[in-house]
Amino acid sequence: MNDVATIHATEREQARMGDLLELIPSRGESVLDIGARDGYLARLLADRFTRVVALDLVRPDVADPRVESVEGDATALNYADDAFECVVCAEVLEHIPEASLERACHEIIRVARHAIVIGVPYKQDLRYGQSKCQACGRINPPWGHLNVFDEHRLEALFGAVTPARFSFVGHNRDRTNAVSAGLMRFAGNPYGTYDQDEPCVHCGAKLQPPNGRTLVQKIATKAAYTIERVQQAFVTERANWIHARFDKVAERVGGGEP
């Protein structure tokens, strides 16, 4: 399990959080933080907004009287239309099953009155760092991420609102290829993201690394890494995250008067 306090203190995480805050209004009446987890961002937002609601699938435990913690689902938000001046949804959409993704984005647009700020991984290679569930035997994407995003996909998902700004944070060279990914699967995916908090996306069991590998599996693992090292010479570095600010314009969302 990850130590969230240690993660928040890292330079990488501080850069991500700082960039998000640049996109969020400097002051306002109300904000909804979807996927609040430990409430780190919600506490920062309490310095800017009169009302802060921290929402997650499990009610966040936020030790700040300025923050209202609630249990909720991004695909079915229990709030009226235009309920919040700003809605922030960071590190969430990549976890939502494809069949429910458009619904979640629709809900975000519906409850936002003015600003929407989204943060997701940028062009992530979901083959890199796969794990294998020891309970059901199925392959899991890294960190429980189910979707891949770039600016074009975000614009399509949030087509009812106006894109105001995109920003790109961090650096990433994590890439693999079909051959290496296949060899890793044969080897039992021994080096997947087993320290993640997210359970198996198929059966809900906690992910555990395999107990051991045969000699042939070890050879397959080494071959996979060798091919990836060769590939790295041709990999172009790109951002780790993409952040987007959308502004809700009444005429665009509702159509306005003819």
Task: Show where each model-derived region lies.
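A short glycine-rich, Lys/Arg-flanked "PGG" loop and its adjoining helix->strand segment in the class I
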Residues: E102-V117
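Conserved N-terminal segment of class I S-adenosyl-L-methionine
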Residues: M1-V88, E102-C105, Q134-G137, P141-N147, ...
